[in-house]
């Protein structure tokens, strides 16, 4: 490609002007301290430096200062940096939990069960303790977004030379990081011990550099600095009156050591240097959501030092030339020639490659790559997934670096409880075990069980048939024994039990993150029994159920328990066919639809579902049921049963209190309105709507790590009143 001679001459003159100007003026080292979220204030300082046309010749950062400094060193525009931190979903980044929209449906299926909100990784069938409190997949992805996926090994080759400061966990020595994978170096500098895992660097295990050198003024002078602009965002000392908690005392103890070294560094500043200390009031080192306030505080403090800063300002022409030099040094991506997977033991590299949105011969689309990596991470096999772009002559090698969990066996446990504060209470203990990657296509075996009022055991072998997992076959076996309450005059007087024992084979297709479709053939023995003497003979009925079915599920709710947006739909059809050996011939279809709408802080969760026997007569064990919490709440559990039914429910709620992320999501207060009906007629008819029971009430609920709690107080037709307290999935 040819360039006009005038363009070449202009660029050359700009470069020569910049070199000459740099030789005449003092070189400026920008030194950014650590301080957790308070370090976002550094961006406000950068905005003022840009407006004042003050160039930066090198940057040194510790902890959060290393993050802002690293982004700056790559040539990232300050406005882009500001937008990135003010729009970031910090709860998601630090929670390290996949967004539900990214989770494949075969993982979402667990949301329909009463498991606690955590998964145990097993090694040799023993739980593996967590290595740290906070995962690092999403925060590392965020750092890669800030640095643009560059291919620079030596930090002197960055548009602005850069150093990050860390501490060696073993020796306590200061580690000056001057080369390597920049996003990992940034993470190493802010890896608070016990919260984030240490990062290997050369022969060190690096953690947050703030504990040894929170402000590297001396390193700034070594790197380039004739003068130093130092920004101190560390937390101020806490007075005695506020040292009342264990956390406050621990934080103060660390802060004493940090401040001691910082004051020694600050004491080396000369009259030619500039020290900027933003005043951030009550904002703390964990207030990442207040990014805009931190940036404003940084701007205010820098403007207060503007007179000192202007000593090093350039003219408009010279500053543009300096910026042009930065842009010409910025990394430019080359086409991808090869993709390789490293560090994978049992997860198939071929499966991972099939899921990556990367095309050979094209320049990397970082946003697209991050999206596909996040979807792979959401499968639940990895602690984190990193990548590197390695330069070649004309192209780049993309290396994917997945870090697998310590085992491929996973366990979940849970609990469900219910009481209507009268004579109906129940509980159940649930547990699940899963072994993943039985073969190179990603086969999984899982077993689930429940002990309590409901007793069940289910096992399935889930075998994908293609690399990307789009199609699968799943043979299964189950025993399921559940109660059916007998209700008279709105009181539960006795209980029947229904047992299904058998198995089947499903073949299906995964609809990406949206859902799945299954076709099944099954054979089960069905039996029901009763606690009432006068119906025991009839209740001893046992019959063979052989047939085929279809299930289709669409699931895009953002939260399965208390959604704010999204849809969920399910179609379930089954035909017990005497031609296949079934003792009875019948059909049933059930359609369930849910949608969440949110206005400001208020959410309306609408549900509509209905079922029909399609003109056949359903056995007692297969009849549709209504009654119980959030299932026509004013009625007792199983009070209404028949061949056809419908239910509509509107649940409007608002979150009234936050729960710490380690304990759950929030507390909700809502209003409930339900109506529905059940008919024993074989065919769906308008008579189903002639007399429709209803229920209205108030719901107090909490989204916790143990599961969703609901306290429902409802009033219905015929002067019905009920209260239900429930732990577990109710709909």
Language-model-derived ranges and their functions:
Residues 22-62, 70-390, 405-406:
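Patatin-like phospholipase
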Residues 166-169, 178, 278, 343-345, ...:
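Flexible glycine-/small-residue-rich
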């Amino acid at each position: 490609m040819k360039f006009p001679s005038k363009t070449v001459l202009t660029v050359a003159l700009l470069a020569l002007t910049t070199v000459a100007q740099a030789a005449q003026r003092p070189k400026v080292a920008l030194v950014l301290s650590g301080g957790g979220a308070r370090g976002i204030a550094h961006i406000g300082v950068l905005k003022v430096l840009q407006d004042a046309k003050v160039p930066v010749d090198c940057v040194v950062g510790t902890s959060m200062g290393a993050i802002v400094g690293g982004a700056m060193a790559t040539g990232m525009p300050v406005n882009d940096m500001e937008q990135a931190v003010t729009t970031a979903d910090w709860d998601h980044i630090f929670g390290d939990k996949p967004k539900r929209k990214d989770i494949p449906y075969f993982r979402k299926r667990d949301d329909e069960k009463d498991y606690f909100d955590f998964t145990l990784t097993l090694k040799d069938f023993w739980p593996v303790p967590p290595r740290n409190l906070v995962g690092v997949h999403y925060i590392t992805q965020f750092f890669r977004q800030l640095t643009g996926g560059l291919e620079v090994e030596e930090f002197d080759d960055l548009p602005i030379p850069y150093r990050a400061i860390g501490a060696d966990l073993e020796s306590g020595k200061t580690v000056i990081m001057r080369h390597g994978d920049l996003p990992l170096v940034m993470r190493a500098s802010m890896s608070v011990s016990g919260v984030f895992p240490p990062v290997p660097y050369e022969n060190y295990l690096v953690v947050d550099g703030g504990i040894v050198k929170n402000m590297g003024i001396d390193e700034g002078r070594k790197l380039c600095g004739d003068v130093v602009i130092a920004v101190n965002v560390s937390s101020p000392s806490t007075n005695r009156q506020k040292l009342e908690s264990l956390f406050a005392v621990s934080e103060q103890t660390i802060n004493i050591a940090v401040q001691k070294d910082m004051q020694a560094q600050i004491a080396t500043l000369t009259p030619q240097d500039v020290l900027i200390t933003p005043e951030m009031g009550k904002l703390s080192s964990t207030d990442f959501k207040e990014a805009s306030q931190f940036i404003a505080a940084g701007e205010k403090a820098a403007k207060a030092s503007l007179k000192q800063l202007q000593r090093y300002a350039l003219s408009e022409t010279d500053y543009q030339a300096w910026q042009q030099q930065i842009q010409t040094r910025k990394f430019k991506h080359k086409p991808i020639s090869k993709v390789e997977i490293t560090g994978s033991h049992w997860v198939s590299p071929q499966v991972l490659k099939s899921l990556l949105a990367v095309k050979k011969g094209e320049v990397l689309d970082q946003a697209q790559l991050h999206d596909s990596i996040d979807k792979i991470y959401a499968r639940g096999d990895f602690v984190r997934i990193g990548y590197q772009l390695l330069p070649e002559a004309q192209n780049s090698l993309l290396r994917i670096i997945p870090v697998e969990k310590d085992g491929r066996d996973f366990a979940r446990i849970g609990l469900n409880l219910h009481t209507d504060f009268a004579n109906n209470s129940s509980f159940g203990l649930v547990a699940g075990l899963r072994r993943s990657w039985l073969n190179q296509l990603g086969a999984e075996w899982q077993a689930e069980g429940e002990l309590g009022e409901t007793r069940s055991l289910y096992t399935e072998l889930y075998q994908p048939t293609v690399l990307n997992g789009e199609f699968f076959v799943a043979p299964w076996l189950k025993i399921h024994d559940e109660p059916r309450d007998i209700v008279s005059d709105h009181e539960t007087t006795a209980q029947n039990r229904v047992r299904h024992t058998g198995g089947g084979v499903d073949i299906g297709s995964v609809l990406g993150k949206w859902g799945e479709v299954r076709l099944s053939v099954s054979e089960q023995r069905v039996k029901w029994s009763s606690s009432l003497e006068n119906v025991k003979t009839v209740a001893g009925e046992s019959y063979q159920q052989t047939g085929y079915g279809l299930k289709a599920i669409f699931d895009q709710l953002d939260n399965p328990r208390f959604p704010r947006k999204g849809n969920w739909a399910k179609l379930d059809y089954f035909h017990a066919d005497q031609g296949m050996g079934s003792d009875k011939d019948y059909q049933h279809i059930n359609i369930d639809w849910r949608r969440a709408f949110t206005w400001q802080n208020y959410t309306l969760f609408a549900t509509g579902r209905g079922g029909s026997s399609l003109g056949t007569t359903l056995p007692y064990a297969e009849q549709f049921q209504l009654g119980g919490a959030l299932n026509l709440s004013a009625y007792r559990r199983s009070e209404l049963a028949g061949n056809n039914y419908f239910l509509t429910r509107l649940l409007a709620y608002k979150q009234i209190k936050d729960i710490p992320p380690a304990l759950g999501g929030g507390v909700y207060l809502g209003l409930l309105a339900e109506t529905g009906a059940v008919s024993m007629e074989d065919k769906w008819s308008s008579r189903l709507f002639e007399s429709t029971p209803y229920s209205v009430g108030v719901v107090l609920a909490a989204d916790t790590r143990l599961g969703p709690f609901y306290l429902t107080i409802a009033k219905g037709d015929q002067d019905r009143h009920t209260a239900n307290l429930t732990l577990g999935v109710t709909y």
